[in-house]
Design a protein with these regions (language model features):
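Hydrophobic alpha-helical segments
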Residues: 1-133
Length: 133
């Protein structure tokens, strides 16, 4: 159970309902997911988080599937079970295959392991990498 519980649509303030309505319309869903219902205890944060999510997760220089794969990778590293489940489902809808998911997990595992090795050895950055920014 969420720390503060969930605010369901029928119990939501008009301000929260407006955000819920936008989420449902944008995502073409008929029910707001638990993440948003948990954030609704702070309507300002709910609105800001939704606006940021809507903008950043929209296709841009990176396509929608790539953004979902990045979201899954970061969520795996952060051990956010909810985010892994939600964004793996979204990535599958956008074309992620089982092979892609398994390869993503391999990259996440390799990156985490190598990051720890670099940190432990306190490896200085090569000049050739400093210019890349």
């Amino acid at each position: 159970m969420s720390t503060l519980g969930f605010i369901e649509y029928d119990k939501a303030s008009p301000e929260v309902r407006a955000v819920y309505d936008d989420i449902m319309a944008t995502r073409k869903i008929d029910k707001v997911t638990n993440f948003w219902k948990a954030l609704a205890h702070d309507p300002v944060r709910l609105k800001r988080t939704w606006e940021d999510t809507k903008e950043i997760m929209s296709p841009g220089a990176l396509d929608a599937l790539t953004k979902e794969l990045i979201y899954v990778a970061v969520s795996v590293s952060n051990q956010c079970d909810y985010c892994i489940a939600a964004h793996s489902a979204a990535a599958r809808k956008k074309g992620m295959t089982t092979a892609m998911f398994n390869e993503l997990l391999s990259v996440v595992g390799l990156t985490n392991a190598n990051n720890r090795l670099v940190a432990g050895h306190q490896v200085e950055i090569d000049d050739q990498f400093k210019a890349v920014g």
